[in-house]
Regions:
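Anion-binding alpha/beta catalytic cores of soluble intermediary-metabolism enzymes, centered on
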Residues: 1-266, 271-336
Length: 336
């Protein structure tokens, strides 16, 4: 069974309630229908019920009726969620009138449904920008305990079985924080390891990547990686992590043994933490395009409950996979 199938099966075995705020978006609705057909998750669609069911009929989506459909402009908990938002944001000057307006926004409403305990995760972004998706998540759900930095991981399914776990690698940050400081980079390492375990089922072996291996080069950007490694070890002493390592030393046993003898990670890494967003974004796209790897994500991490962001160029299959991944993150969050 391939990894995506394993992710889907784990979701089926422990169904989570996933909110889809873009309930009338075509790819989202078609993926939702397949999720409901396959029994992968319980779905909450936000939007006008008549419009959603009309589109489902038009597109031949016979299982959308199995979803819970909530109209942001008319539902029983509207005032309850507005009061919750007002309380959460009162120090920022939120009024009840302002909260009542924001509750009509599906992206805010979805996060409030999660915060109230009425859902387990959210997926959006087929229509909305990353900023629009993240803003309510950070205002309402907030970051996970001990974490101040949201980041994004990419699941890479490569054709190099000698690397990672039979070619499976997880890389972060590829999506959110442009130039992390040492503390943020340590948090990215911790969160990417958690994502690797929760989503890919890996026993994380984390490499902090650089252009230097164990002091082979001197530069302030190398110093940042070394400091981040120290902080990450303090945050999670049980985590298998090492650095700084060049990419070949992290992935290739022969090179790892030569450049970093005695390292438990060198040549065996399945989680790659890059020093900045620029490196992460370029790297995964090179692996995807030149190495013909399958890149799944980005998977947002560091938020107290899973909220994921789609590319506006996503396919129906992308939405399907990300619903299953969001469900896996929700399962892991409950187990912590």
């Amino acid at each position: 069974m391939d990894l995506i199938s394993q992710i889907v099966e784990r979701a089926k075995a422990n169904k989570q309630r996933i909110v889809l705020p873009e309930g009338t978006e075509e790819r989202t609705l078609k993926a939702a229908n397949q999720i409901l057909t396959d029994g992968v998750a319980e779905l909450i669609l936000l939007g006008n019920p008549d419009e959603i069911m009309g589109l489902a009929k038009e597109w031949g989506l016979g299982n959308i009726h199995k979803a819970t459909i909530i109209d942001p402009e008319n539902h029983p908990k509207q005032e309850e969620y507005a009061q919750l938002l007002c309380e959460l944001r009162k120090k920022k000057g939120m009024t009840i009138e302002g909260a009542r307006k924001l509750v009509l926004n599906p992206l805010y409403l979805g996060c409030l449904i999660i915060k109230a305990g009425d859902a387990d995760g959210q997926l959006a972004g087929a229509r909305n920008t990353t900023g629009d998706v993240l803003r309510p998540a950070l205002q309402i759900i907030k970051t996970a305990p001990g974490i101040t930095c949201v980041s994004g991981a990419m699941l890479l399914l490569t054709h190099a079985p000698e690397c990672g776990d039979n070619g499976v690698l997880v890389m972060g940050d590829v999506a959110v924080t442009p130039v992390p400081d040492a503390n943020q980079l340590a948090q990215i390492a911790i969160c990417t390891a958690q994502t690797a375990k929760a989503v890919a089922g890996l026993d994380p072996r984390v490499a902090m990547l650089s252009f230097s291996t164990k002091g082979s080069a001197k530069h302030e950007v190398v110093d940042k990686v070394v400091e981040a490694l120290k902080i990450a070890k303090e945050m999670d002493p049980a985590l298998k992590i090492d650095g700084e390592l060049q990419a070949d030393a992290a992935l290739v046993p022969r090179v790892g043994a030569s450049k970093a003898p005695g390292s438990e990670i060198a040549g065996k890494a399945n989680v790659l933490v890059v020093p900045c967003l620029e490196v992460g974004n370029i790297s995964y796209k090179l692996v995807e395009r030149l190495g013909h790897a399958t890149a799944v994500g980005p998977i947002l991490q560091g938020i107290a409950r899973p909220v994921n962001d789609l590319s506006r160029g996503c396919s129906i299959d992308d939405v399907y996979k990300m619903i299953a991944i969001t469900a896996n993150q929700a399962i892991a969050a409950k187990a912590q």
